[in-house]
């Protein structure tokens, strides 16, 4: 029996779309949400991001069904995820800077740095042959936290949570690699 995700993937493939099309469509939608955020339309942006969330899973299902999974597709998906997340946080930073809300701007930068470092520490760890999946706040969790904050009109709380927990996650990954490297050295 096909899952709803597989049915959607099959339908989109029949329309002539590819997994990469869906990945880029998702990014375009996220950039649109970032613009909404920049102008203070948090609820609409949260709704748009929520509606776009399934596309992040559909592109992979499409690639598997079409039997065209590729390293480039996985790479493109990861890169567009980073662009999308940074665009959303950038929209908030812009909005708060226009409001003169320095605390929001600073938290936005710390959250953005943490988010990038969560991804970077995992990629670098895995590139060196270590496991880099540990931590309390992966991309999916960060997205959920941000969506909730946008939907309730209080993204500052979400960004504060992301700023703290994303950086803790990056540190957890650093310490995990340190432990793994000590085990490797023996």
Residue ranges and their predicted role:
Residues 15-20:
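Active-site flanking loop/helix segments enriched in acidic
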Residues 73-78:
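Membrane-interface alpha-helices at helix entry/exit sites of multi-pass transporters
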Residues 23-72, 102-113, 155-165:
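Membrane-embedded alpha-helical segments that form the functional core of polytopic membrane enzymes
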Residues 21, 55, 68, 124, ...:
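Short, flexible coil/turn micro-motifs enriched in small/turn-prone residues
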């Amino acid at each position: 029996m096909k899952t709803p995700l597989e049915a959607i993937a099959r339908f989109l493939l029949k329309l002539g779309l590819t997994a990469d099309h869906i990945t880029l469509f998702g990014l375009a939608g996220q950039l649109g949400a970032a613009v909404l955020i920049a102008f203070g339309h948090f609820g609409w942006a949260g709704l748009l991001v929520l509606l776009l969330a399934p596309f992040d899973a559909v592109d992979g299902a499409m690639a598997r069904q079409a039997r065209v999974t590729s390293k480039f597709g996985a790479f493109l998906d990861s890169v567009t995820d980073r662009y999308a997340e940074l665009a959303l946080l950038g929209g908030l930073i812009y909005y708060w800077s226009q409001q003169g809300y320095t605390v929001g701007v600073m938290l936005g930068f710390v959250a953005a740095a943490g988010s990038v470092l969560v991804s970077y520490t995992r990629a670098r760890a895995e590139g060196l042959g270590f496991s880099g999946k540990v931590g309390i706040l992966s991309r999916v969790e960060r997205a959920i936290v941000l969506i909730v904050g946008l939907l309730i009109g209080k993204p500052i709380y979400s960004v504060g949570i992301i700023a703290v927990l994303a950086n803790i996650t990056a540190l957890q990954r650093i310490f995990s690699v340190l432990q793994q490297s000590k085990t490797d050295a023996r």
